[in-house]
Amino acid sequence: MTVSPVALRRKTECKPHPTARYWKKCDVEALFGLPFLDLIYQAAEIHRQNFNPREIQLSTLLSIKTGGCPEDCAYCPQSAHHNTNLGKEQMMDVDEIVEKAKIAKSRGASRFCMGAAWRGPKPKDVETVSAIIKAVKGLGMETCGTFGMLEEGMAEDLKEAGLDYYNHNLDTDPDRYNDIIHTRRHEDRMDTLGKVRNAGLKVCCGGIVGMNETRAERAGLIASLANLDPQPESVPINRLVKVEGTPLDDAEDLDWTEFVRTIAVARITMPQSYVRLSAGRSNMPEAMQAMCFMAGANSIFYGDKLLTTGNPDEDGDRILMEKLNLYPLQFELEGEVAEVEKASGIKVDY
């Protein structure tokens, strides 16, 4: 059955699992308005009903083609429209990418995510990334790609190559989408998400907060994600990383409690999705990250770089996970406790 972009917005009568519902923006905003500790408590309860709260899924993200993107996203240093001193680079060599994936796996990552600064790939680009996907899959890792808007048949080609997840974020509240991006529409994102679902790929879809949006607009973003049908398997929540030269480099800092609220509301509205702490984590104190894990975050990017912005170094993440008695998801599922400690350096205490 073909899934149209309209059908991706969950209707009240469409319930793929018992917890599914249509989320009105006002109802999501009401969740944001709950007393902080009550909200965290509710989110933690829902998290524990669906996941082991001590397991954290580790992904590593690599930019395989950096800079020169024709899109004008106000938050992105890779846009050719912004003067960020980030030059356009050619696509990385396949062997170099595979070597990066090997290193990521050896350090405990279970998923290797690859991003390319395109509006959308050309057919020859799909051939190239398909070869890369096959090579990474050969290492025994999950694969995720973020390559922009897809034409007909491209998602099927990526699926055939072995791609597991396709990342395509909704970025912000649909009602303010054109305030942030002028070179594409919210409907264009929905169209590609429909192609991805029709091809049988898993969906990684989230957004960015801290772009001068209101709480109501944050609620609009979460509602638009929660009403995708089915809900995304993976939901990355990014905290804006301000980069000089981008239109948002002077954005007002988002209060840390508001970010934690966003994580909690994402968990409540998308109970079976992996909620990932994504960009902006390098500026988050350990206590703030701990609150995010308590509120339902159960995935992080592992490695010292996210596309072009910084990320906590692996040693710091190991120390934090040990302090919080958290461990990587991958090896626990295989029952290999010794492998957890060997690959990630994190001591597992059951």
UniProtKB/Swiss-Prot annotation:
Metabolic or biological pathway: Cofactor biosynthesis; biotin biosynthesis; biotin from 7,8-diaminononanoate: step 2/2
Entry cofactors: [4Fe-4S] cluster; [2Fe-2S] cluster
First-tier enzyme category under EC: transferase
Keywords: 2Fe-2S, 4Fe-4S, Biotin biosynthesis, Iron, Iron-sulfur, Metal-binding, S-adenosyl-L-methionine, Transferase
Annotated transmembrane regions: none
Signal peptide residue numbers: none
Molecular function, one GO term: 2 iron, 2 sulfur cluster binding
Database matches in Pfam families: BATS (PF06968), Radical_SAM (PF04055)
InterPro entries tied to this protein: Aldolase_TIM (IPR013785), BATS_dom (IPR010722), Biotin_synth/BioAB (IPR002684), Biotin_synthase (IPR024177), Elp3/MiaA/NifB-like_rSAM (IPR006638), rSAM (IPR007197)
Domain of life: Bacteria
Gene3D superfamilies in UniProt: Aldolase class I
Annotated residues for binding of [4Fe-4S] cluster: C69, C73, C76
PANTHER family assigned: BIOTIN SYNTHASE, BIOTIN SYNTHASE, MITOCHONDRIAL
NCBIfam families: bioB
Stated role: Catalyzes the conversion of dethiobiotin (DTB) to biotin by the insertion of a sulfur atom into dethiobiotin via a radical-based mechanism.
Family: Belongs to the radical SAM superfamily. Biotin synthase family.
UniProt protein name: Biotin synthase
Lineage: Bacteria, Pseudomonadati, Pseudomonadota, Betaproteobacteria, Neisseriales
Recorded name of the encoding gene: bioB
